[in-house]
């Protein structure tokens, strides 16, 4: 098996998007290619067909490679849940909750074993594996326990690309500093520098690139133009850059940016709707008068509920008279009570919810992770696909109407004002999303949008193609293939 490694000078340098683009470019050339990230820290998770949790970014990369996601592509997922702790997902299943010190002490050896086993599995199935690092490989205080950067590259002997974000400023210094910090055996694997998010005159930049290559001895192999892509962010920091401006929007939908927001990829398809403005509001923000509010998923539902109460946002939501949709943790928050008898989210106890639907939630040891294909009851007969990731079990009052043929997946109030579902990816289903939006439009006296079958995955495929088309002229794919050792096949 051949391998390439992509590391970055910092978080948000563009590693994930570069792996996605390379995956699609090699896939288009007929190469059996797969993505890999040994350890990911993110609250955007995806559930594979086997019921394993992996980072959503690796699922996106798998789709770009023309594959169904598998746990081998991301054997370790860390899901931050506040108080400097994270839930450890090892080989797709929960393994415990711990802080950083305990994690490095207790999970390094089993974690590395999981990484090695996953790589061996991918080696047996694919011609090329494109590995992604995390953060920066130059964190000297963490190198001895690093499971996902140059340790992986050394294990595979993988030629490595170093990507940097020039839009932030200081990119050349970031590259120089990163290379100087790396030990000689790791630096020797860095075969190319990729400049990302460039906008401006390449002629003005070229002297700097020439100096960088001469000073470091590593060639600059790509200068990637700035792209406005709707592919998912890996963590919630990207939400702070989403302003929601859209002049032609006829509907405004507010998503409450919970402190521990999870799976905000649920709103990618909604943001792609030309007639919809999605605005993210923090608990201490002003709700305004949107057409609908969405309470998203949360990695720590009770602390986020308490944050809503303490900030006054809970009172704003209760006083709001429009449509509200709760997804997963958001559904639990909308209910009457949340009971955590064993203290999975901290101290044991029962907490009152917002009380907007008659529903009680109890947190239990068993975590449900599964893909779902189900028929919708509202609208009737529409096929819907999505996935569940939750620990709580919710009991609904009989006065609530089931949204799906599996009643536990979601309900709506009799006045069609409060909706709740455990189904992540629900809004990716075109017909269901358009029916829901048309109900909002009807309240405003707006004409109905056409309702077509299909799924957001078709739009995602178009984005993969646009990404590959935009970056192919700026990346020496034949050269990368030669570096990886299979030039004759491309």
Curated annotation (Swiss-Prot):
Gene Ontology MF annotations: ABC-type vitamin B12 transporter activity; catalytic activity
Positions of the GATase cobBQ-type domain: 250-432
Disulfide bonds: none
Stored InterPro entries: Class_I_gatase-like, CobQ/CobB/MinD/ParA_Nub-bd_dom, CobQ_GATase1, CobQ_N, CobQ_synth, GATase_3, P-loop_NTPase
Entry keywords, A to Z: Cobalamin biosynthesis, Glutamine amidotransferase
PROSITE patterns: GATASE_COBBQ
Catalytic center residues: 328, 424
GO BP terms, alphabetized: cobalamin biosynthetic process
Pathway(s) this gene product operates in, as recorded in its UniProt entry: Cofactor biosynthesis; adenosylcobalamin biosynthesis
One Pfam family it belongs to: CbiA
Family: Belongs to the CobB/CobQ family. CobQ subfamily.
Purpose: Catalyzes amidations at positions B, D, E, and G on adenosylcobyrinic A,C-diamide. NH(2) groups are provided by glutamine, and one molecule of ATP is hydrogenolyzed for each amidation.
UniProt protein name: Cobyric acid synthase
